[in-house]
Amino acid sequence: MWDQQPKEAPHATHQTAPMYTKNFVNPCPDWATALLNGFSQVLLQRNPLCGLFCLLAILFSAPELIGGALLGALAGLLTAQRRGYNRVDRQAGLYSYNGVLIGLLLSHALPWSAILPPLIIAAGGLSSMLVHQWLKRSGPQQVLSAFTAPFVLIGWAVLLVGEPGASSAAPLEHNALYALARGLGQIFLLDNPLAGLLIAIGLLLANRYAAAWALLGAAIGGSVALIGGEASAAYAGLYGFNAALAALAFSQTRRQPWLPLLAISLAIALQPLLAQLPVPGLTAPFILACWLLQIGQRALRQPLGRRADRLHS
């Protein structure tokens, strides 16, 4: 999973405002809402129902990973609470979503040992602190959003020094719908089409427009991989998840539909380059694609004289 071969408006950010469906009454206590929002924030949504479907996707398709995902999310949330970080941001899931992905990655990539749970807790807590530093510096002058950068940086560090467990790739059905579903499932390191279906339902409940863009991104990514002769990667969804995330990041720019399309194209183009790294690229193509677009948007909005001045600052 997430290997290269199987063997917001102008500044896209994670959601901090409620995005609940119409007439939805949230029955969860605050801590559960924060956790579920952490799962949905992986998809750049704030919606506990969406988060619940993401949780179910993991539970039904890879139950052995659910403990790591919950542990990573809890570590991020409790670290934020212990350190007195902004409560609104905690409830929005901003301190949990990187922990979710870190818990999934470490549970999948590393063999079980007594050190694995403490490692997930430490990595999840560290991701929370990195997000906080990023949020502290956010403002009018902040160009780049954090996205899943803490997850990627911590994940790369652990994979470089750790000893990943052996994994075998099962034969995949050459089915276009299954490939599309896997493209969404791989966002959570899941290669089961059922996982992708549940994630798609969660996205539809949170934001139908965003769901449509995510599906389009996954479809374009898989199609490009097929055309490029990467059939195995295409049917595994490995060219779909970064494109889907890039589309989600710019899906709210309704008056500029070319932005999510450009984000999708950049994410797909960057994926083969990042495949040359000694570790899996994870969500780095998505992050870099969005950062390039954000830098470009900032440069275009800045007056020419001011841009020239900044070259020497």
What are the functions of these language-model segments?
Residues 75-88, 128-139, 199-206, 246-252:
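C-terminal ends of transmembrane helices
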Residues 92-166:
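Membrane-interface helix-loop-helix junctions at boundaries between adjacent transmembrane segments
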Residues 143-195:
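Long hydrophobic alpha-helical segments that form multi-pass transmembrane helix bundles
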